[in-house]
């Protein structure tokens, strides 16, 4: 499986962006849920 460096970098950048977005989304949901529990 041979991938050109540019394509590989593009793939890793997308993968990294997806992980960062997932972490941000998960953290936002977690904090919003925690905030609701604290308010109750």
UniProtKB/Swiss-Prot annotation:
Places the protein is found: Cellular thylakoid membrane
Superkingdom of the source species: Bacteria
CC terms in the record's Gene Ontology section: photosystem II; plasma membrane-derived thylakoid membrane
Keyword Membrane recorded: yes
Membrane topology, from the record: Single-pass membrane protein
InterPro entries linked to this entry: PSII_PsbX (IPR009518), PSII_PsbX_type_1_subfam (IPR023431)
Residues annotated as transmembrane: 10-30
Keyword line: Membrane, Photosynthesis, Photosystem II, Thylakoid, Transmembrane, Transmembrane helix
Any single GO BP term: photosynthesis
Function field: Involved in the binding and/or turnover of quinones at the Q(B) site of photosystem II (PSII). PSII is a light-driven water plastoquinone oxidoreductase, using light energy to abstract electrons from H(2)O, generating a proton gradient subsequently used for ATP formation.
Family, similarity comment: Belongs to the PsbX family. Type 1 subfamily.
Quaternary state and interactors: PSII is composed of 1 copy each of membrane proteins PsbA, PsbB, PsbC, PsbD, PsbE, PsbF, PsbH, PsbI, PsbJ, PsbK, PsbL, PsbM, PsbT, PsbX, PsbY, PsbZ, Psb30/Ycf12, peripheral proteins PsbO, CyanoQ (PsbQ), PsbU, PsbV and a large number of cofactors. It forms dimeric complexes.
Descriptive protein name: Photosystem II reaction center protein X
